[in-house]
Amino acid sequence: RQSLGVPPQVKGPFQVVRPPLRTSVNSYTLPILQYIRALPLEVITNAFQISLEEAR
C-alpha cells in the first residue's frame, strides 16, 4: 500500500502548483489586454506619436 500511496503524493503537488501559476498569469495579462482593448484608437495613436517624437 505504501508503494501505491507514493505516486499520488508526488503527482499531487505538481497538479496543485500548476493551476495557480496559470491563473496568476491570466490575472495579470487579461486585465491589461482588456484595458488596452477598451482604449480608443485615438489614444493609442497619440501615445505612439508622442513616443516617436520623444525618440527623435
Swiss-Prot record:
Keywords: Allergen, Disulfide bond, Phosphoprotein, Seed storage protein, Storage protein
Keyword ATP-binding applies: no
GO molecular function ontology, one term from the record: nutrient reservoir activity
Spans traversing the lipid bilayer: none
Top-level taxon: Eukaryota
Keyword Phosphoprotein assigned: yes
Signal peptide annotation: none
Record PTM Phosphothreonine, positions in chain: T45
Similarity annotation: Belongs to the 11S seed storage protein (globulins) family.
Task of the protein: This is a seed storage protein.
Assembly and oligomerization: Hexamer; each subunit is composed of an acidic and a basic chain derived from a single precursor and linked by a disulfide bond.
Name of the protein: Cruciferin
